Amino acid sequence: SSDLSPEQKNEVYRRVRDGEVDLFYLSPELLLAYDISYFVGERRIGLVVVDEAHTVTTWGKEFRVDYWFLGRHLEALKNALGYVFPVFALTATAVWNPKGGNDMIFDTIRSLHLAPCALYVGTVKRENIGFDITAMTIEEGETYDKAKQRTVAARVEDFLDGHKTIIYYPFAGGIDMKLKTWVYPANWHWVASYYGKKDKEQKAEIIQAFKEGEKKIIVATKAFGMGVDISDIDRVYHVAPSGTFVDYIQEIGRAARDKNISGVAATDFNERDFYYMKRLHSAGAISQEQLGMILKKVWEIYLMKGCSDEMQMSLSDFEFAVRLPRKKNKLEYESDLEQVIKTALLWIEEDLSFRHGGSPVEINSQTLFADGYVQEKTGDAAFRKKYKQYMVPVEGVEGVYKVAFESLWENCFSEMGYREFKRDLYNGNLFEGVRAAVVGKHDVLLKESAADICFKLASLLKSLKDLLTVSLYGNKGKFEEDDLRSIFAAYDMDVPSAKRFITSLLESRVEEGRSVSYITSAKKKDEDKLMFTVTRGFDLLLSRYQKLCAQRITGKKGGRLLFYVTPFSDLNMLLNLLSMLNVVDFTVEGGVPSVGVRVHDAEILKKEATSGSYQNRVLENNEKIFQEQIELFRLFFGNTKLSDEQRWEFIEDYFTGMNLEGLKEKYSCVVECRLCKV
């Protein structure tokens, strides 16, 4: 658990290895990060339990990809250990729909490699939970936001009168401010907020206070729920629909765990509530264009590595395609990057398998951080002597060593957790008295001569500088995405590519230990286009990249360059920008974790990667399911006349495979019939 310190974790692992502990809880991410012997030593595994197994096919396909990789990892583990252990998967909310696109049960069985298996099906109905679902009214002259604030505040007053309540709000950002607009100051002491970024001590205190009745209401994101066992919650209120209907059923199921209590799931619904759902969906979304770029990059790396069937691909190789905000905490940024890239590669693997059969491309479940490079510029002899068993000098490069990171950690820094080891390694604080930093080996292929590359970049940066300067002084820094069209057309780049280039160049940088951004963007009203706002200082940054290109990019077309630099340095970003301009290809080894990729059919990979029109069916299906979820909530919340019994029947119909059209036919009719009788 993340609540334990590194020392506490190591003590737990020791107790498991020594046979003092027989039941051991850990996350899929932790299981996939280490050799199994690190946890259990020489002991045999008797049983693996996958609790909340619906997360395998929900979280696993979106934001915690190691859940999806769990099954193949367990299968590989059985092969490596030479014996079989049973796997027991449990969930209260999985959709049974073997012929539909939203099946979760058989998808989970497939993902976890459970077949053949015994399948036990219970009921989703909770007879002691009723519903209070109304249509939110917006009064004359009132905005949606004001109406929502008034409605939730009235609910809060009711909930404070003798109830224990969870209020679910979709966004962590601003949740504390919202809380204060919903609750009178005199009642603030009865209410607490709960979301993922609160520290573990705060979370524990909030849960304990809620359990003991010192807090009557928790305003929470979906982070509150799993693993929290409080039996006397009697109200669950949703400010807006959950991310999925399955999430909604999970969340209302936290009410009335004590069967002697009557719980109520409440919502005041308005059509504009779907804004929250859509914003959450788009926040971490991967586009078809990005998937196409990542697939193309896999093909380019395959060629650069001599068409090797098995390759390690650094997360940095794909950084240009996803454009995540840079963070001061490099490990957090790396973790975000890992989730997005592994998810994208998983979707590509699934799609190619679906289209062509077999496994044209196979992604390894584990992210490796076994070997890498460290640069120590002072030439400290004592440092070299102390760690020579784990470090080999790189020939021809002064002060750079190839390092067996895992062996170094296990033998010299095992008192630290692996995450803390990586943090200090990244920050140059691992080796006492020595400034030794992690660097990545950047292997660069010039697709044009260095002179042509530098000229092309300089010309583009000058055109951008002219646009940004005019915008800054003539239009309060604002310009539209269409303004980029004519500039980037000369470099064979369309508007989406132009947006990616300029935001990578100017957005979310870390300078002198702080996050800075020279550009922001927002959607134009009633248009699916962006309006950008640029701030002062961009010209110095453009000049810096132009000079860096002239200094470091040398040689003829087809030449190779080798750089050892930190993963998120200016040179690394320059190479990403040049890659977007299609004037270099490059790969990174070491510095950041890598993903193993095995190519079983290079012809299929080439065909799809170079087609220029790749469309990923997994993403298409995800989008279809998302739209169906909106329709599902619209039907469930919009029909305010449904009785509690009918709502639970609706839920059971959905979980046992009735499709959206069937639900519409059955429950629209139910409402109409009831209205007719009235």
Question: Which residues fall in each region the model found?
Answer:
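Post-DEXD/H (motif II) to motif III coupling segment of the RecA-like Helicase ATP-binding lobe
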Residues: 41-42, 46-47, 54-121
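Catalytic P-loop NTPase motifs of RecA-like helicase/translocase cores
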Residues: 31-32, 55-62, 96-97, 227, ...
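Conserved helix/coil segment N-terminal to the catalytic DExD/H
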Residues: 4-47, 57-61
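Structural recognition of the conserved hydrophobic beta-strand(s) that form the central parallel beta-sheet
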Residues: 24-26, 47-50, 86-91, 217-220
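Inter-lobe coupling/hinge segments of SF2-like helicase ATPases
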Residues: 126-142
